[in-house]
């Protein structure tokens, strides 16, 4: 069958790589993709992921059987709805169901209604109300802007001054807009991907841990993710089971109950508190860079899993008996302003590197985004995989990239 992947980043690179391995898949297309994907897929950078008509026309011309949507924006914009209305099979939720990521308030209200464990929250609609709220709230407090923010719309404020600064960032020159304040939760964060079709929810039996902060020791601003690893040895199978029972199954039923038919992967960003696992966020798609490490470890056929889910079967994931560590190299300055167009070399176009922000200029690759390339390390355990990942990092040549030196350290310290 012919499969079309939508998106241009490392997550989509990993999806295309994994789908290309399937015996069920004849051809993988990617729109818009990036040139690093050309060994495994037919890439069409001339079509934008926001060009719904162009994507639809292409899918018709190429007799595409399945469309797999990687990023959140096309889901929120209703690309899945348009494709389904024209008879295409789509892995990814419709516009209504994608609100679970598109609106933090939408997600909080559903969790509140169905008693799904999460932090207490307060919503405000005006800047002046936000400034009033922080006069009497407990610190630290988590400040979240409603809507999509590429993983960067969350600020943890330790003081009232930091909270004021966060409010200024969220509102800018505007006086109105939804901001959600949450009680700060302490504990160990982890990411659980769950395949969902209506009330059928099948969680991965392998979790990943992301590293959101820009710099070592979890310092600096939030980013889209500076690295990830799996499995997470210090979070037990019992926690995974509990997360499934108290979060994954209830949210699938709650969405259906509220009239939202979710089909695709639901990312559960959770935290293990002293009171058990609680939800930090939901995403309506694979995490990035969690997808890259999880799909590298997945032994079974991703396309078969998607078909099983579509047919309402409880699919069984199989995993390689190894650990995976992924280290992200980003443009200096990210997640704030950064320069583009700097040469990057030294890496191979294979499963050891997944490209997020590079484009071809003549025969060389140059930077085109904030997060640039993820180096993948593999090993019998997290320690060996970490060493392998940083060896892969050392092969990359560029004066304009930075990376964290402590990806997966937590697993080694907490063993």
From Swiss-Prot:
A GO term for molecular function: metal ion binding
Protein name: Phosphoribosylamine--glycine ligase
Cofactor: Mg(2+); Mn(2+)
Keywords on record: ATP-binding, Ligase, Magnesium, Manganese, Metal-binding, Nucleotide-binding, Purine biosynthesis
Gene3D superfamilies: 3.40.50.20, ATP-grasp fold, A domain (3.30.1490.20), ATP-grasp fold, B domain (3.30.470.20), Phosphoribosylglycinamide synthetase, C-terminal domain (3.90.600.10)
ATP-grasp domain boundaries: 108-311
SMART domains referenced in this protein's UniProt entry, alphabetically: GARS_A, GARS_C
Binding site for Mg(2+): 281, 283
Catalysed reaction, written as an equation: 5-phospho-beta-D-ribosylamine + glycine + ATP = N(1)-(5-phospho-beta-D-ribosyl)glycinamide + ADP + phosphate + H(+)
Name of the top EC class for this enzyme: ligase
Pathway annotation from the record: Purine metabolism; IMP biosynthesis via de novo pathway; N(1)-(5-phospho-D-ribosyl)glycinamide from 5-phospho-alpha-D-ribose 1-diphosphate: step 2/2
Any Pfam family the entry gives: GARS_C
InterPro entries: ATP-grasp, ATP_grasp_subdomain_1, PreATP-grasp_dom_sf, PRibGlycinamid_synth_ATP-grasp, PRibGlycinamide_synth, PRibGlycinamide_synth_C-dom, PRibGlycinamide_synth_C_sf, PRibGlycinamide_synth_CS
Family: Belongs to the GARS family.
Organism encoding this protein: Staphylococcus aureus (strain MRSA252)
Gene Ontology biological process terms from the UniProt entry: 'de novo' IMP biosynthetic process; purine nucleobase biosynthetic process
Note describing how the cofactor binds: Binds 1 Mg(2+) or Mn(2+) ion per subunit.
Residues at which ATP binds: 134-191
EC number: 6.3.4.13
């Amino acid at each position: 069958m012919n499969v079309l992947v939508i998106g241009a980043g490392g997550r989509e690179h990993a999806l295309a790589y994994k789908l290309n391995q399937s015996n069920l898949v004849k051809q993988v297309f990617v729109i818009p993709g990036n040139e690093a994907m050309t060994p495994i897929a037919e890439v069409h950078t001339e079509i934008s992921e926001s060009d719904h008509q162009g994507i639809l026309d292409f899918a018709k011309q190429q007799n595409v059987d399945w469309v797999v949507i990687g990023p959140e924006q096309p889901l929120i914009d209703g690309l899945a709805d348009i494709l389904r209305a024209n008879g295409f099979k789509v892995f990814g939720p419709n516009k209504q169901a994608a609100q679970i990521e598109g609106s933090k308030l939408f997600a909080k209200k559903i969790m509140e209604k169905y008693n799904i464990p999460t932090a207490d929250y307060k919503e405000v609609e005006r800047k002046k109300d936000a400034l009033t709220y922080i006069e009497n709230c407990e610190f630290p407090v988590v400040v979240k802007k409603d809507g999509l923010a590429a993983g960067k719309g969350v600020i943890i404020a330790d003081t009232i001054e930091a909270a004021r600064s966060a409010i200024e960032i969220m509102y800018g020159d505007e006086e109105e807009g939804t901001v959600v304040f949450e009680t700060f939760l302490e504990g160990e964060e982890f990411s659980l991907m769950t395949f969902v079709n209506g009330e059928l929810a099948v969680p991965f039996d392998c979790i990943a841990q992301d590293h959101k902060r820009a710099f070592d020791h979890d310092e600096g601003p939030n980013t889209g993710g500076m690295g990830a690893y799996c499995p997470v040895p210090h979070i037990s199978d019992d926690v995974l089971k509990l997360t499934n029972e108290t979060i994954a199954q209830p949210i699938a039923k709650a969405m259906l109950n509220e009239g939202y038919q979710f089909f695709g992967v639901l990312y559960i960003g959770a935290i293990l508190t002293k009171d058990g696992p609680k939800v930090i966020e939901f995403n309506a798609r694979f995490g990035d860079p969690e997808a890259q490490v999880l799909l590298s470890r997945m032994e079974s056929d991703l396309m078969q899993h998607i078909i099983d889910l579509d047919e309402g079967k409880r699919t069984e994931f199989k995993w390689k008996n190894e650990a995976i560590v992924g280290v992200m190299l980003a443009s200096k300055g990210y997640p704030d302003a950064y320069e583009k167009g700097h040469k990057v070399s030294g890496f191979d176009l294979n499963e050891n590197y997944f490209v997020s922000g590079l484009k071809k200029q003549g025969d060389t690759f140059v930077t085109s985004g904030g997060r640039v390339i993820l180096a993948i390390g593999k090993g019998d355990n997290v320690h060996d995989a970490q060493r392998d990942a940083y060896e892969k990092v050392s092969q990359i040549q560029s004066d304009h990239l930075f990376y964290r030196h402590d990806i997966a350290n937590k697993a080694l310290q907490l063993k």
